[in-house]
Design a protein with these regions (language model features):
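Hydrolases whose catalytic domains are alpha/beta-hydrolase-1, hotdog thioesterase
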Residues: 94-99, 117
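Catalytic histidine-centered segment of alpha/beta-hydrolase-like enzymes
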Residues: 161-176
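A conserved short beta-strand
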Residues: 102-116
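Serine-hydrolase catalytic machinery in alpha/beta-hydrolase-like enzymes
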Residues: 1-82
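Short beta-strand/loop motif that positions the catalytic acidic residue
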Residues: 125-126, 130-133, 137
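Gly/Ala-rich beta-loop-alpha elbow adjacent to hydrolase catalytic centers
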Residues: 86-96
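Acidic catalytic loop of the alpha/beta-hydrolase fold
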Residues: 135-140, 163-164
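Conserved alpha/beta-hydrolase "acid-adjacent" motif
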Residues: 30-31, 117, 138-144
Length: 191
């Protein structure tokens, strides 16, 4: 499968141990750095990766939450894997209620912790979860992040990272992306 000539599905070199559904951000496609590093790590750990591509600007009148849920549910319905993991970035973290209802493990990059439905769903999910966000991100609530960490979530909180997990400094942004990649790697190693 392709989107705009780009592949949307990736298979690991050996037998697959499950599938990861990747729900991107509003303006952060699956090929952007954080999601691409996550794709590589998932493949290294034996996961098939199914990217969900969307144009969030053309969703019409549909609310964001149900719109994201519909896309993730459709991608999930196409899969036969016994094990499913959800990866969401920003807008894609509106899939948290869907993941929680099914107890799916998840990696949430810059989750919308200021949205009570997202925070509650992450807190209610019995699956393993990693959250990565920054204190310079207005959509990251450090108090909520602490509560979720106390509830069992793994949390990477970067003091100077914004919603793109970056800063105005190119080298520091690369360092932050490396921190996220290491956190994802450690999370998957424990899976």
């Amino acid at each position: 499968m392709t989107f705009g000539g780009l592949p949307t599905r990736w298979e690991p070199p050996g037998a697959s141990r499950g599938v990861a559904l990747v729900a991107p951000g509003r303006s952060y496609p699956p090929t952007a750095p954080l999601l691409d590093f996550t794709r590589v790590a998932l493949l290294q750990h034996g996961f098939t990766v199914q990217q969900i591509w969307w144009d969030s600007l053309t969703r019409g009148e549909e609310e964001s939450g149900p719109w994201v849920r519909r896309h993730v549910a459709a991608a999930h319905a196409e899969e036969q894997a016994d094990r499913v993991l959800v990866v969401g970035k920003s807008l894609g973290t509106l899939a948290a209620p869907y993941a929680a209802e099914r107890g799916l493990d998840a990696i949430w990059l810059t989750p919308l912790l200021t949205d009570p439905s997202v925070a509650a769903a992450i807190g209610a999910n019995p699956g393993r979860q990693l959250l990565a966000g920054g204190l310079a991100d207005e959509l990251w609530d450090p108090g909520v992040a602490r509560e979720l960490e106390q509830g069992g979530c793994e949390v990477l909180e970067v003091p100077d990272a914004d919603h793109g997990m970056g800063t105005r400094d190119a080298v520091r942004t690369a360092e932050i992306h490396l921190e996220v990649a290491r956190a994802v790697e450690a999370f998957l190693a424990g899976a």
